[in-house]
């Protein structure tokens, strides 16, 4: 009886290991990392003289962190949300200057909740998008995007 139980237990252990090997592995955007990205992005824009809102979302487009600089227009929060959603929807930086993904025929502005404005940048671990950082409030989306890209470059070692 003991021999059968030992064999059965070994079989379960092997089955569990095989099942685990088949499960997809994924990275999750932690709150700590989201806060660091938001803070670095806001610090860069502030140093450049811009009052902005920074929004960091996870892979499901759910807000993790939002920071609004003092004196920032309330509308920047909604625009940042739309930039983040656009980034996650198309898995690329937001903005009209970006080419559409292969097979995509509709420009991003035709999808409700998206916007044709730069400032949304994917947060990637390798080729996997784990979230997005979106910025609104600088005088031009290129400046919004530059702040986000600066923060992601600064924190690149944490995105491995």
What does each model-identified segment do?
Residues 6-20:
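Bacterial N-terminal signal peptides
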Residues 20-160:
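Flexible, solvent-exposed loop/hinge segments and secondary-structure transition points
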Residues 1-5:
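Positively charged n-region of N-terminal signal peptides that target proteins for export
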């Amino acid at each position: 009886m003991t021999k059968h139980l030992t064999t059965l237990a070994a079989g379960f252990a092997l089955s569990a290991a095989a099942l685990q090997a088949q499960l997809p592995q994924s990275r999750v955007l932690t709150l700590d990392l989201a806060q660091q990205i938001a803070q670095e992005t806001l610090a860069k824009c502030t140093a450049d003289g811009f009052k902005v809102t920074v929004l960091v979302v996870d892979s499901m487009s759910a807000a993790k962190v939002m920071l609004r600089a003092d004196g920032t227009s309330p509308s920047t929060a909604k625009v940042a949300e739309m930039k983040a959603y656009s980034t996650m929807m198309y898995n690329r930086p937001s903005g009209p200057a970006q080419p559409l993904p292969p097979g995509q025929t509709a420009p991003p502005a035709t999808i409700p909740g998206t916007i044709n404005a730069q400032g949304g940048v994917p947060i990637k671990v390798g080729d996997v998008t784990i979230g997005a950082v979106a910025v609104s409030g600088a005088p031009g989306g290129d400046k919004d995007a530059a702040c986000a890209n600066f923060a992601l470059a600064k924190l690149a070692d944490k995105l491995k």
